[in-house]
Amino acid sequence: MLKFLKNLLDDNAREIKRLTARVEEINSLEPQMQKLSDEELRAKTGEFKERIARGESLDELLPEAFAVVREASRRVLGMRHFDVQLMGGIVLHEGKIAEMKTGEGKTLVATLPAYLNALTGRGVHIVTVNDYLARRDAEWMGKIYKFLGLSVGLVVHGMDYAEKKAAYLADITYGTNNEFGFDYLRDNMAIHPDQVVQRELYYAIIDEVDSILIDEARTPLIISGEAEKSTDLYYTFAKIVKQLVPGEDYTVDEKAHAVMPTEAGIHKVEKMLGIQNLYADEHMELTHHLNAALKAQALMKRDRDYVVKDGQVIIVDEFTGRLMFGRRYSDGLHQAIEAKEGVKIEQETQTLATITFQNYFRMYEKLAGMTGTAETEENEFRKIYNLSVVVIPTHKPMIRKDLPDVIFKTEKAKFKAIVEEVARRHQTGQPILIGTISIEKSEMLSEMLKKRGIPHQVLNAKYHEKEAEIVAQAGRLGAVTIATNMAGRGTDILLGGNPEFLALQELRKMGKTPEDDPELYRELLAKYKKITDEEHKKVVELGGLHIIGTERHESRRIDNQLRGRAGRQGDPGSSQFFISLEDDLMRLFGSDNIAGLMDRLGLDEDTPIEHPLITRSIETAQKRVENRNFEIRKHVLEYDNVMNQQRELIYSQRRRVLFGEDVLTFVHQMIEAVVERAVDTYCPDGVHPEEWDLKGLLEYAHNVFLPNHQLTPEDLADTGKKALVEFLVEKAKEYYKKREEELGGEQLRELERYVILRVVDEKWMDHLDAMDQLREGIGLRAYGQKDPLVEYKIESVEMFNNMIAAIQEDVVRYLMRLSVVRQPETRRVRRVVENRYQEEGPKKPYRREQKIGRNDPCPCGSGKKYKKCCGRNG
């Protein structure tokens, strides 16, 4: 391990040495750039583009391009890139992760590689964690790009197609990870080329890369539609599980985040429902409801996992503490929580399209990222994303003091001690930032501080609109701020306060903006600058910002992020964690020896302990959890890779159809595939030709690819299998040619595209559901001494092939039955295509001699029952 670390440090030192040489090259160009007029500096952009067109590489252009951006930034924003920021920019351009400590100006660093790569004209995406940061950075850094003649776009929630399309066509586009991912999924559900907004995925720079690629790696982006199911059962089961006794009727495994009913519990539920066997086939839906209700009751905690706001259950992001509007738990869990809380149950949803961040961002040709804490997860970045981490030195030496952890026996004693520590430091005027792991804990601590008469600000997911403003002032004299986890990430805490925010606040009270009255804004800024400068001196004398962690997170990286809020850019600062043996990490993963040690020492509740054994035990517990989480993410990726290959295949074919790449060829290929499969089914290999089911084949042909044919079994007799396929394919294509003459080529091409896209989307949706069910049950194969992943791969390929066959069959059936459709009738055709298919499995040929029952599938091929389709007026 030590050898590995030594190599790692040596590698990083070598990397810094290499980067220093390039930085010197950029610095040597600075005097030359300073002599240029604004017009001459701006003209450099056109010159660089011409040089790229002539074959010059971006690496060759880098020193000059970076020097141009640095000079533009100095003129436009009054901010000159430091040497360490230039290093960060080079690392990002090379498709790596730059670890830069909090306050080192990551936002400004991104302008360097963004400008250089945007010169190709292929578009650069800068990805942030929330809408506020995306807007702020697009507006703030956008001034540099616009000065240099590049366009800037912004992609946030709630924009329409035209706005998004324009934003993606810009040279540099800012947006959130969610929006980029959802736009990709929406593009792959588009029915018309005009609805597609994204260009190719060329280069992405991810801010807070650890948050997006690691913390959210297991969170899939899902676009869903409503499924037609009643919600009554959720209320029924919410009442039932409230009557069950924990430990007696069900068991909870907090480590595995699982809950299981016991035999006694199952009997109790059966009695309440008045049924004999809950696990009988016909009660499968009931077991699903019971499991969801138990999870909602026993595992999901209000104000920790979710909040109830305006009659809605809203998920809380466990890593940032932010509310995740629009996100819902899947598999009925969200509905079960709604029933538990007694709010209106939203319709259960069906997945229409899904992708994980892991797979979305791996599609970019070049990927880079920035964060203050990546080193602890370097292994994961390299293994999963093929991204190496370079630790960039700080501009000024770090002088923050990280004090040893203080451990208490109970949570009550811990919070009591925290309040005492806050009161002691607050008396001196030192600013304090307290990090909590949940909304519930932050509100509890807030109540305790209120009772002590300590004024403070609470920053949690419930008030994230005020996030940046509160965080920006957390460094003021006497400020006490409670923040859940990493809420407010991306906003610097300036010692003494942020004069710009204070000036803006006062302007807002007057109902004005800086654009309305620039003179007044400048006056206010000068006034507050004087105040904050005075406060800055006092705060520095008091030791800077003090961080109090109320609990160790299961990831060391999150703890480091909290600590990193203090001691920015050479400022003084300090940090300390207060821990109790009742904290989740200690309870679930800590050693039992610690409680024993405290008992042996005869310590009472209020006496803290600082002991090397305990510090080691905490670190061991964190490493254990980190390794477990890495294994889970790796495991998720292995399964998702199977799905990803299928998604890429479906989406690439879908795009070809969407953009009209010879759709007729697609249709012909589908006809050939359908005919070949039909001949294989009715005339199997190894069966004598005299025993072939030619009658069945012709009935199937009539139903699918040759409606109204006049062929008889005798016409097909004495023909070899290959010749039979060729004969039927030719007949089907001839028939389709007639359809084209009747309808007109242009109208048919439009309908072909529409039918193919709709059928593909329908079948893909069903396939996603089936794959989810397969994945949920596949773990049981391990009991049969089989590798679940291998089994999953085998079965998913079979399911995928079946889906492709079903797509081909349905498309051919619909297109063959499109007799002359006049313009006003197009909507009816679309309704037929959009209708959900009710039949599962291979569709049986329609037999002409049979009487059609009212509940039989309609022979027109719509998939509806006869009584609801052509037989409606019969």
Curated annotation (Swiss-Prot):
List positions binding ATP: Q85, G103, E104, G105, K106, T107, D492
Q: Name one GO molecular function term.
A: protein-exporting ATPase activity
Reaction(s) this enzyme catalyzes, per UniProt: ATP + H2O + cellular proteinSide 1 = ADP + phosphate + cellular proteinSide 2
Give the family, as the similarity comment puts it: Belongs to the SecA family.
Question: Keywords of this protein's UniProt record, alphabetized?
Answer: ATP-binding, Cell membrane, Cytoplasm, Membrane, Metal-binding, Nucleotide-binding, Protein transport, Translocase, Translocation, Transport, Zinc
Record-listed Zn(2+) binding positions: C858, C860, C869, C870
Gene name of the encoded protein: secA
Assembly information from the UniProt record: Monomer and homodimer. Part of the essential Sec protein translocation apparatus which comprises SecA, SecYEG and auxiliary proteins SecDF. Other proteins may also be involved.
**Superkingdom of the organism of origin:** Bacteria
Provide the species name.
Carboxydothermus hydrogenoformans (strain ATCC BAA-161 / DSM 6008 / Z-2901)
Which cysteines bridge via disulfide bonds? none
Q: Where is the composition biased (Basic and acidic residues)?
A: 839-854
Q: Which SUPFAM superfamilies match?
A: Helical scaffold and wing domains of SecA, P-loop containing nucleoside triphosphate hydrolases, Pre-protein crosslinking domain of SecA
The organism's lineage? Bacteria, Bacillati, Bacillota, Clostridia, Thermoanaerobacterales
Annotated EC:
7.4.2.8
Gene3D superfamilies reported in the protein's UniProt record: Helical scaffold and wing domains of SecA, P-loop containing nucleotide triphosphate hydrolases, SecA, preprotein cross-linking domain
Protein name in UniProt:
Protein translocase subunit SecA
